[in-house]
């Protein structure tokens, strides 16, 4: 089975920057937007425009680490695509079911690959942080965080350094990782080192 990791964070919080130490062949990067990476690199981003294409692309990936960047936009684009051919109240359920199916496909792949889903974070009126969706109806039917035991938050710490928060520091935090996987509440913003270090073995 593949390993699924979810990384949530605001725009500019260092999600994509955490890929800076990967070399060509070590990682596949998939994006619905095809944005250039925010650092000089030989790595290329593969443009995969919608969920239907994503479903076909995932089994074809070869690198040990696969990044699905800007994952929220798959929901936005798919919802817009089916807005007029579905009942307005059924469309969110359809989108949620389809995206959940993608994550299930990843989990049950017969592979040792690690798939990292990067997405923007949402904060509700009570301060609870979750995977950002395209509306309340969709949020009711979609909880990607529940499909993995590794959810990290990309953020800036008190010293101005970009880090991944890996342990829940409040009941409103989305983060969770297996017990004893990490010794600290946060780790450096570097997914490559996380692949090689123990106990921080992503």
Q: How would you label these PLM feature ranges?
A:
Residues 57-58, 74-77, 109, 151-154:
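Conserved, well-folded catalytic cores of nucleic-acid-processing
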Residues 65-143:
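P-loop NTPase motor core
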Residues 1-61, 65, 72-73:
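Conserved P-loop
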Residues 115-186:
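Phosphate-binding/switch region of NTP-binding enzymes
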Residues 16-17, 39, 77-78, 126-128, ...:
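Short glycine-/acidic-enriched loop or helix-start segments at secondary-structure transitions
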Residues 40-46, 54, 160-202:
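P-loop/Walker A phosphate-binding loop and immediately adjacent motor/lid segment at beta-alpha junctions
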């Amino acid at each position: 089975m593949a390993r699924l990791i979810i990384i949530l964070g605001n725009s500019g919080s260092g999600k994509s920057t955490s890929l800076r130490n990967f070399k060509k062949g070590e990682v596949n990067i998939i994006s619905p937007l095809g944005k250039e990476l925010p650092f000089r690199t030989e790595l290329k981003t593969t443009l995969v425009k919608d969920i239907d294409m994503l479903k076909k692309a995932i089994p074809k990936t070869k690198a040990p680490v696969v990044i699905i960047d800007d994952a929220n936009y798959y929901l936005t684009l798919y919802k817009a695509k089916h807005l007029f051919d579905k009942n307005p109240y059924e469309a969110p359920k359809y989108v949620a079911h389809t995206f959940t199916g993608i994550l299930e496909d990843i989990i049950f792949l017969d592979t040792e690959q690690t798939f990292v889903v990067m997405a923007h974070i949402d904060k509700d009126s009570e301060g609870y942080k979750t995977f950002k969706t395209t509306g309340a109806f969709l949020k009711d039917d979609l909880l990607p965080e529940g499909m993995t035991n590794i959810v990290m938050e990309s953020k800036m710490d008190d010293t101005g350094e970009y880090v991944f928060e890996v342990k829940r520091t409040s009941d409103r935090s989305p983060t969770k990782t297996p017990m004893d996987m990490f010794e600290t509440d946060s780790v450096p913003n570097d997914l490559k080192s996380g692949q090689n270090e123990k106990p921080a073995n992503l």
